[in-house]
A protein has these predicted regions:
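Active-site neighborhood of glycoside hydrolase catalytic domains
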Residues: 194-215, 222-328
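Carbohydrate-binding surface patches
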Residues: 408, 419-457, 469
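Aromatic/acidic polysaccharide-binding cleft in carbohydrate-active enzymes
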Residues: 317-402, 417-420
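Bacterial Sec-dependent N-terminal signal peptides
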Residues: 1-23
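C-terminal beta-strand-rich structural cap/linker in extracellular carbohydrate-active enzymes
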Residues: 465-477
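N-terminal catalytic cores of secreted or lumenal carbohydrate-active enzymes
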Residues: 35-213, 234, 244
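Loop/turn elements at helix/coil->beta-strand transitions in domains of secreted/extracellular proteins
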Residues: 66-67, 99-106, 152-156, 209-215, ...
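Conserved, mostly hydrophobic/aromatic
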Residues: 70, 102, 157, 216, ...
Length: 477
């Protein structure tokens, strides 16, 4: 009798494995929220006549994928700290666990940002010997990052300064007088070595706290003089700073931390002498060798700029490092924002050769805060908003779905693979092969509900059931 039960159990296990292997797993979200990362299954290996077709070719590989995620700003970390511990861990696990939505890339500020609890750097007193982490890092940001790392140890972290210490600033390179302001100014070339050491000390301090840093950018929005905490840094300055100081400092300290250039808008803030900012930097081979690639934001211009930069510098990487939602672009209204943001921040970036995409604040409260004063964004929403009357109730906004749908289909270490050169009408999509050999596909459908054949290397893969005005992520082996 026992042998028979064991045999039946083994047969059931084998049947379940075979059944699962024959299934395509999916997550779907539509603009009405009636589908909200709703899981489904589709049978593999079938097709229907007369349907449009998405053709996938896994023999053609493009860039490797580092991941998708959001910024852990001071404001985000503060809001997380106010949540009950169990509720916070549940949210972070659902968001970052590789077995769930799998966010895997975050961005943090080096010193303050416009979403910090105060304006500060890590060395406000003149003299680099006064460097030190502040309460914003030790009480809020680092504990949040360590909790996320306990959930997803492979998390990649990008660090970016909004401003250098004020004692390192001059009004301009043409008028090199001291500049005692958080907003604007330029880095004094006499402080290049101190500022490079500032980066090294920050990376080492974070590592000592259990937070490894994957990459940095030399300056957030270097062409924006008016942000709450900012520093103007044209391409000539960034080229010189990294070539003369930052790159050599990383090598001397034996830091295997990538440096990404630029970190600003597709349209270079309409400054003619700054267009194609990274390409100018790469023209100097001694500077270019220190740069892994370039980072971009989308507050101006078109993601088609990514294709231009990749075409001219195919040996350099690209990453998308910031976008925000708010009252101006209806980020809480999925009717207006869901498909737009999936297509612009997920699909257009990876199809434009980006290795990853990071959006702005992971969590703000329902009053869009906390945030800084003059020059800061008082109208931004978080990837999610938390109700500040209970610090438990969470509302997902469009950026959450954009990053979640990409993350469940394309795991870190995946490669983007080829799809139809001519897109199917009304659809936007991207396909991937993951490190475990599974495939991922993200499809945005702007039209009515429809069926689409999916083929892989010339063979029927499955029939995709696309709800109206929805995004669906698929994964299968």
């Amino acid at each position: 009798m026992n042998k028979r039960l064991i045999l039946i159990g083994l047969c059931l296990m084998l049947f379940c494995r075979i059944s699962l292997a024959q299934q395509v797993l999916s997550y779907a979200t539509d603009v009405t929220r009636s589908l909200d990362m709703t899981k489904g299954q589709t049978t593999k290996g079938i097709s229907k006549t007369g349907l449009p077709e998405i053709q996938i070719n896994s023999s053609i590989r493009y860039q490797e994928i580092d991941g998708f995620g959001a910024a852990i700003t001071g404001s985000t970390a503060y809001n997380l700290s106010l949540m009950p511990a169990e509720a916070r861990h549940t949210f972070l696990e659902e968001t970052f666990s590789p077995d769930k939505y799998g966010f895997s890339y975050v961005r943090v500020s080096i010193g303050c940002s416009d979403f910090s609890l105060s304006e500060y750097t890590l060395c406000d007193e003149p003299g680099i010997e006064h460097f030190g982490l502040t309460i914003e890092e030790t009480k809020y940001v680092i504990p949040a990052l360590k909790e996320i790392l306990s959930i997803n140890p492979a998390l990649k972290i990008m660090g970016t300064p909004w401003t250098c210490p004020k004692w390192m600033k001059v009004k301009s390179l043409d008028e090199p007088v001291p500049y005692d302001s958080w907003t604007g100014g330029q880095l004094n070339p006499a402080c290049y070595e101190d500022y490079a050491h500032y980066f090294v000390l920050w990376i080492q301090a974070m590592q000592q706290a259990g937070v490894p840093i994957y990459c940095v950018t030399p300056q957030n929005e270097p062409l924006n003089r008016g942000n709450s905490a900012s520093l103007f840094m044209g391409w000539k300055e960034q080229q010189a700073f990294v070539k003369q100081a930052l790159g050599p400092a990383f090598r001397k300290a034996d830091l295997a931390v990538k440096i990404y250039a630029f970190d600003h808008n597709y349209n270079y803030d309409n400054m003619p002498d700054q267009r194609q900012y990274p390409l100018h930097i790469y023209e100097d081979a001694d500077a270019a060798r220190f740069f892994a690639g370039a980072a971009y934001h989308n507050y101006g211009g078109s993601p088609s700029e990514l294709l231009l930069i990749q075409r001219e510098a195919p040996d350099k990487e690209l990453v998308f490092s910031e976008a925000s939602i708010g009252t101006w672009n209806n980020g809480r209204d999925l009717e207006k924002s869901l498909l737009r943001d999936v297509e612009q921040l997920g699909l257009a970036t990876v199809n434009g050769w980006c290795r990853g995409s990071i959006v702005w604040n992971l969590m703000l409260d329902n009053d869009r805060g906390p945030h800084r004063g003059e020059g800061a964004c008082a109208t931004c929403y978080g990837v999610v908003d938390i109700d500040n009357t209970d610090y438990t109730t969470i509302t997902r906004n469009s950026h959450f779905y954009a990053m979640a749908h990409m993350s469940v289909a394309a795991k870190p270490g995946a490669y983007r693979i080829a799809t139809n050169e001519e897109a199917v009408d009304g659809l936007a999509y991207a396909a991937f092969i993951n490190p475990d050999g599974s495939y991922g596909l993200v499809v945005s459908n702007r039209g009515e509900a429809q069926q689409v054949n999916i083929s892989l290397n010339g063979n029927a893969a499955f029939v995709a059931e696309l709800p109206a005005k929805a995004v669906v992520s698929y994964s299968w082996k």
